[in-house]
UniProtKB/Swiss-Prot annotation:
Divisome component that associates with the complex late in its assembly, after the Z-ring is formed, and is dependent on DivIC and PBP2B for its recruitment to the divisome. Together with EzrA, is a key component of the system that regulates PBP1 localization during cell cycle progression. Its main role could be the removal of PBP1 from the cell pole after pole maturation is completed. Also contributes to the recruitment of PBP1 to the division complex. Not essential for septum formation. This is Cell cycle protein GpsB. The gene is gpsB. Pfam families: DivIVA. It is found in: Cytoplasm.
């Protein structure tokens, strides 16, 4: 936007030189001014396109990040809901293993039950 030569007020208040009274404005002066106005509008249009492209890119990135947050949140909720079941399942497996060890090894474990209780 540094290449912009005129503000809307500059255009509104532009005074053209009169070449001869009654013959109108100096054509070269008017043409030069209009050339500068056209350049400004081209610069505005390019900047507007760039900003629109950037805006579209940033919106797409925000949408993608929101999807990632939703997926992460969903996975977190699933993990949290599975965790109590998993803990209960692990405890159940440990109890079964302990019962099987008692049955297989019989009295050998009964004497050492107090020493191995920290393993459960």
């Amino acid at each position: 936007m540094d290449n912009i030569k005129f503000t809307p007020q500059d255009i509104l208040h532009k005074q053209f030189k009169e070449r001869n009274i009654g013959k109108g404005y100096d054509e070269a002066d008017v043409d030069a001014f209009l050339d500068d106005v056209i350049k400004d509008y081209d610069t505005y249009n390019k900047e507007l396109e760039r900003l629109n492209d950037e805006n579209e890119r940033l919106r797409a990135k925000v949408d993608e990040l929101n999807r990632q947050v939703e997926v992460g949140s969903s996975m977190s909720n699933q993990t949290a809901s599975r965790q109590p079941v998993s803990s209960a399942t692990n405890m159940d497996i440990l109890k079964r293993l302990s019962n099987l060890e008692r049955r297989v090894f019989g009295s050998q474990l009964d004497g050492n039950d107090n020493n191995d209780s920290h393993l459960l």
